Amino acid sequence: MLLTLLFLATVTAQPAPAPQAKPAAPPPAKAADVETCLACHSDRTMAVTLPSGETRSLYVDLETFRSSVHGTKIGCTDCHQDMMTVPHEARPFKSLREFTVAYYEQCKRCHFDNYTKTLDSVHYQATARGDRMAPVCVDCHGAHDVKPPQKPKSQMSTTCAKCHEGVFTVYKKSVHGRFLEQTNDVPGCTDCHRSHDVAGPRNIAWQRRTPELCRTCHENKTLMDKYNLSTAVAQTYVADFHGMTASLHETDPNRTVSVVALCTDCHGVHDIAKVNEPGSRVLRANLVKTCAQCHPGVSDNFPGAWMSHYEPSWKKAPLVYGVQLFYNILIPFMIGGLVLQMLLHFWRVVVNR
Amino acid sequence: MTTYLIRFSLRQRVEHTLVMSFFLILSVTGLPQKYFDASWARWLINFMGGIDHIRQFHRFAGVSFTLLTAWHLMFAMGAVAAGRSPLSIVPNRQDFDDAIQMMRYYLGRTDQAAKFGRFDYRQKFEYWGLVLGAVVVISTGLILYFPILFTRFFPGELIPAAKVAHSNEGLMAFLVVILWHIYNAHLNPDVFPFDKTIFTGKISLERMHHEHPLELERIKQVRDIEET
């Protein structure tokens, strides 16, 4: 009887996602499902010991589940499909990790697009290599307690920090990381690395897109005005040697590697600093060292060859501006004069005939 | 019976062919670098094997052009020093007078076209324009080739300034050649479709009479020339 009810409950639960159902009043069918399971699983002492010696609590806190994103939308057996019979069949899991990994594919039944994205990720590459510690859905999102990932935004990054603690510590001190808790304006981990299809740091295609990544914010006028930052950084980069080469390598169909300074090569990656703070790599005092990463043995004058993202003007780079102005006047004057001379000559020749 | 004169020596003809080839290579590999953001430039760059290849071609042609220029100037200076050069390419007062007279002639203010010697003022202008332009592109090109070396002695701003000068000078040279030189050597009704003198070295007496009468007279004083 109980089982029939449960079965009916699961089937009838599938269609008709009640539009804007009040969170306080979950669909009764789901409630039935959850209640059925919780008849046993509300027991706090319920646990199972795995062959690895690890203990897995089988207690489910109703309030935690109810307040999760799934709390009012799906029931226990939507994910735990293999738990339809009571008592449940014996499970072959030897360790906790084995159990978690086994549930990896459950999420794709609803979240198929995000699941397929994970197949392109560096995390999945590790899973495919047989690395059982590589994260699967629930490692980041949680299981019974799945929360909206971006509320607050900093949660995304603190989630990554669970494994990537070293990088996160460096990032937290950076000009972006320092303000992670205060504002949504600064990029967190996933803004650059992506989330489901997260790219590995040695993924060349993704590395080459670095200027594009930085541009998404640093060319956004509203955002940059708020912090009194220039939006010409990408454009001035592309106008110079490094940016020109990088942009041409990007459209070169025959090229797989590109050795040229990208934004992060000068500004740093996770430790990116405000340009004028003492530790900044692009501070005039540190610039020779920064250039020397690629151009060993350069003199103190060498960094001056880079106009620091400025457009040439009388104030900044007067020599460059002067030369440009000279040619802006000379070329039209020269070409205009020659064309006039040609036309006069031609006209005279025609008239003479 | 003489129907033509030898106007250019073999050395001059070879120099012209070389400078023409280098100029073409330098333009084709240089201009797409100046306008790399344009779609035609991107296409051309990818077509020629990518930016790194193009830079190598450009430097190779640039070094060749530098050697040719050095050779030409050394030869010319040697000839001047030995007193063997008639200095006929050096601009003088007469060229300004000629230019003004030709302007008046074109505008119909006088019926008398100026009479030219071995080189007319336009040819002198083009020659010295090339020499001067060569000095600019070669020096700035070397700065761009060896920025680390140059910034040991000069401020860093020299590098972007050299880039601006190099690319603009190159553009101007390209435009002058495309418009002015192509007109004078090809489209000019007097020589259309092709003035072959710089390749064969020969010029007809008729053209000498028409274009360089003073030079013809000078030659007649030292050599016996029968005109047909």
State where each predicted segment sits:
Chain A
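Short sequence/structural segments immediately N-terminal
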Residues: 10-353
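Bacterial N-terminal signal peptides
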Residues: 1-10
